[in-house]
Amino acid sequence: SAASDVYKRQEEETPLADGNAMILSAMKQLGKTRFVTVGHVCIHAFGDCEDKYQRMSTKFMQIFWPGVYKDMQKMGQVLARSDLNWTLVRTCPGRDGKVKKVGQNCSISLDGSQFRPGYSREALAEFLYEAAADQQMYSRKMPIFYREG
């Protein structure tokens, strides 16, 4: 059927990873060195201990969105191979698929030992801005951005 071709095509394509690869290539040609991007918590980083929320979120991605899961894994690999100064901020929306209210306290976990789904858009934007402005902030790392509590 036509629907099966669409699903098959979606699983084979990796637009986010390919887009990041093109951006990294252009940055290298232009002499730019700092790249900050956002990915899903299902991207595994070296040293992750993966708590129950991270494991569940990864399993859901593998089962319900295998194409997106594949794209995220490739994105992590593209960045890890790059010699640029990058930071991949891993996130996960809340159970309802929406971000949480403004002013919610958020934190960072470098090893995945602490993680809760959901976060404030404003808090994420502020963190991304700070990470882009500070050349050394989480350089070549994949911090998990999560809500506290």
Where are these regions (language model features)?
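Short, small-residue-biased leader/transition segments that mark boundaries at the very start
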Residues: 2-7
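NAD(P)-cofactor binding segment of oxidoreductase domains
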Residues: 8-35, 74
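Mid/C-terminal beta-alpha module of Rossmann-like enzyme folds, strongest
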Residues: 32-35, 111-149
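Conserved catalytic-site loops of classical short-chain dehydrogenases/reductases
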Residues: 33-39, 87
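Conserved catalytic-site region of short-chain dehydrogenase/reductase
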Residues: 41-47, 94-98
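Catalytic helix-loop patch of NAD(P)-dependent Rossmann-fold dehydrogenases
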Residues: 53-82
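Conserved beta-loop-beta element that borders a ligand/cofactor-binding pocket
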Residues: 76-97
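Glycine/proline-rich active-site loop of Rossmann-fold NAD(P)-dependent oxidoreductases
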Residues: 82, 97-106, 131-140
